[in-house]
């Protein structure tokens, strides 16, 4: 029987409406992981979610006249293998934009 070494992994999921802010945040996270000698894999792009809202243009009549709005949620995943305590501290102190939603799973 071979012994499998359990490898620690941090999975970071990022979501944002603005793709450029999301990519900048991914670059900062990967750069921080590389500086602390951890291995970062990613950013792995996930499918973009589109939410479409249909609104009547007129407040009273003309149901045939409608307007469509949409929001696009861009998502990325970054995996960090063999993190040290220094890596986790550096990631906690990282200053990221407020428009980016971050989920960290250990």
UniProtKB/Swiss-Prot annotation:
One of its GO terms (biological process) is translation. GO terms for cellular component: ribonucleoprotein complex; ribosome. GO terms for molecular function: structural constituent of ribosome; tRNA binding. The keyword Repeat does not apply. Pfam families: Ribosomal_S10 (PF00338). SUPFAM superfamilies: Ribosomal protein S10. Keywords: Ribonucleoprotein, Ribosomal protein. Gene3D superfamilies: Ribosomal protein S10 domain (3.30.70.600). Part of the 30S ribosomal subunit. NCBIfam families: PRK00596.1 (NF001861), rpsJ_bact (TIGR01049). PANTHER family: 30S RIBOSOMAL PROTEIN S10 FAMILY MEMBER. Belongs to the universal ribosomal protein uS10 family. Involved in the binding of tRNA to the ribosomes. This is Small ribosomal subunit protein uS10.
């Amino acid at each position: 029987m071979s012994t499998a070494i359990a490898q620690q992994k941090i999975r970071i999921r990022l979501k944002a409406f603005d793709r450029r802010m999301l990519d900048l945040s991914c670059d900062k996270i990967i750069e921080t992981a590389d500086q602390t000698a951890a291995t970062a894999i990613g950013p792995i792009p996930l499918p973009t979610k589109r939410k479409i809202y249909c609104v009547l243009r007129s407040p009273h009549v003309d149901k045939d006249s409608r307007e469509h709005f949409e929001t696009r949620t861009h998502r990325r995943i970054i995996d960090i293998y063999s993190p040290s305590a220094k890596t986790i501290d550096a990631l906690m102190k990282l200053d990221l934009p407020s428009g980016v939603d971050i989920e960290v799973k250990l």
